[in-house]
Amino acid sequence: MLAKRIIPCLDVINNQVIKGIQFQNHQIIGDIVSLAQYYSQEGADELVFYDIMASPNNQTVSKKWVAKIAEVINIPFCVAGGISTLYQAKEILKFGADKISINSPALLNPSLIQKLADHLGTQCVVVGIDAWYNAQLGTYQIKCFSGNSSRMQSTTWELLDWVIQIQQYGAGEIVLNMMNQDGMQNGYDLKQLSKIRKHCTIPLIASGGAGTAQHFLDVFQYADVDGALAASVFHKKIIKINELKNFLIKQGVEIRLC
């Protein structure tokens, strides 16, 4: 059995780590390089960096901070933000990232997933999904350009259909961001994650809702995800990664201790 992964998420604007609630009302948390170094030393299994304004502003993530992070941490990290071509993806990997993640660019051009997988290998290609539950319609809507509330828009994709399509194109991993839970700290969307897990044959990372150590245990036990991504609880030091890992090990979860 592969060890479950604990993954701090760092949303980035102008080289600063920020955090909001339900993808809005962002507050500055701190310096991106310092926080990356801190989480690496704390025992994170990997890090994910989202330049959340890149795609909405037709920009690409800054290679400068990617290179700086590669110099100061010794764990894998994934980078997302406006990566819409093979050349851009290669550049990010060349500057030190282990994986690249695409979200809005994949929605705009699904064949990009296959192109990246064919040239870089599936192990390097992550697809992020931002899903918002519309209670009136009773469906999970896939959002595009979710980093900028003024440009964010719903797509015509149903969540499950998009998950299946992503896999057919050759994605190596999916990060499923449940937007309703984002920053709320009231637990992951176990019901929906469990449903998606049944149709997902590649690694699935849960995102949105972590508030306690029990929430991590629940998402591993009930949704059988491969990794749990979180931001607020780590940034605010509500949960320390080494303490979380010790708790999970005592509960029988296979996890790496650093």
Swiss-Prot record:
Keywords: Amino-acid biosynthesis, Cytoplasm, Histidine biosynthesis, Lyase. Its EC number is 4.3.2.10. The keyword Cytoplasm applies. It catalyses: 5-[(5-phospho-1-deoxy-D-ribulos-1-ylimino)methylamino]-1-(5-phospho-beta-D-ribosyl)imidazole-4-carboxamide + L-glutamine = D-erythro-1-(imidazol-4-yl)glycerol 3-phosphate + 5-amino-1-(5-phospho-beta-D-ribosyl)imidazole-4-carboxamide + L-glutamate + H(+). One of its GO terms (cellular component) is cytoplasm. It is an enzyme of class 4 (lyase). Pfam families: His_biosynth (PF00977). It is found in: Cytoplasm. Pathway: Amino-acid biosynthesis; L-histidine biosynthesis; L-histidine from 5-phospho-alpha-D-ribose 1-diphosphate: step 5/9. Heterodimer of HisH and HisF. Belongs to the HisA/HisF family. This is Imidazole glycerol phosphate synthase subunit HisF. It comes from Blochmanniella floridana.
